[in-house]
Amino acid sequence: MKVIEMVSLSTDILQTIDLGKSSVPNLNSQGTFDWFGTLPKRCQELFEDAVLISDRRKSVYGRWDDILSSIHISPTCVVTKRALAQFFTPPDVALYTAFNLLDNYQMEVIFDPCVGYGSLLIATALVLSEKEQLSNWDLVKKLHGSEIDQNTRNIAIKNIAGCLVKISPLLEIGAVEKQLEKQIKLCDFNNYPNKTLSGLRVIVNPPYKEGAKGNIWIPIIDKLVDSNLASMSLILPVAISSSKRTQFLRNKIFANFKKIYAFHHEIRPCPLFRGVDQRISIITATKNLITPHEYITTGFLKHTAGNRMMVWKAPMTKLSKNECNNVFPKVSPLDIAFFKEFESGKNRVRLSEMTITAEHTKEIWIRTTGRYHLLAQYEKPAEITTKWKRLLIPDHIASNFIQAFKNGDLLKWWQIFGDGRDISITSLYDSYRVCL
């Protein structure tokens, strides 16, 4: 299996990003994944428009209607925002996904099980109109999907219809909207449709359910991976694409698909690389290829809506599957030595493997929340909040345990083996191996 990681950007590129410059340095001499130049001209124009959007309330596809404006402006409750599908996939992500999965791939229909505001189906329509020269009702009838929120479904139908009319001016927008109402269903994800479709299926955003812990959609993805799809794309929270609890899904993807592209994209602070942010992963997988397993991924790139092009042009370096440990890589070349030492070290022991007796233990208070603010101390905190946890540690390793917090050893372990969130006390206790 060939595994490639596109590592963190060089200093001059980071300066370009930090200064907000629009020019993109020439990285081809370093070896890059650059797909933009192969796009049809019309797709390039859409992409260029998409990456320049700095205000998510604006749309390259036309005017946002009053419903969308109310979703962005009025709700302050997180539950309400999620229920109204506040978090949408950026247009450039949708365009990349559609362009790659629809390349030389004949299908009956394209099905998006979580439509959002329609960005994927809009990008799909554009690519099909260019590559397969589809237009008018032949193009309209290709686009299918489902959505769990009525308001969001209404937005998607209006946005998709507006795009289709731009592609095929002979279409009448009212008639297109009525047809899309039949093809884009209001659906409860707990009752995911069993109907087999011979086209593309994409998880654009995880469906949200009040009170859930963020993984109610994992069985849906499991079902898609086991299906007879020739191609698919998963657009996931990066923590899920890299976390231990979803390793079984990654193993299935590796087993069932031969060529896999993963792009770690967008902005959300997470302690995976120092000073580098990310929000979502895009995993694109293709079956039935003669070529051996191939896995290509970006590093976690820092950018803003004005320079998303950086995500699609990045230096590359190779890692082996064993070094990635079957996890979509979060390991930079600089961390490989630590990675290998931690895996093979004979002088490390897990806390859960040690016998703890009351007379030979020390009380340690640790705080693992707050992004990079990892604290460990013997003294009981003056104010005990939910952020502080109490652990009993054997005497002879207590000082080493505290030192791991201070010297960055524990943080580096979490960057590689964690899932992008605050450190779980259970994971820490069960998995971290303290130096003897």
Regions from the PLM with identified roles:
Residues M107, D138-K141, L197-G199, L229, ...:
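A general structural motif
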Residues L180, R279-S281, K387, L428:
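Residues that flank catalytic or metal-binding motifs in active/ligand-binding sites
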Residues H303, N307-L436:
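Polybasic, glycine- and aromatic-enriched phosphate-binding surface used to engage nucleic acids
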Residues E108-D112, I260, T361-T368:
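Short hydrophobic beta-strand segments
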Residues I157-L170, G174-Q179:
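Short, conserved SAM-binding/catalytic segment
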Residues F99, E132-Q133, E172, I267-F273, ...:
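Catalytic micro-motifs at enzyme active sites that drive phosphoryl/nucleotidyl and oxygen chemistry
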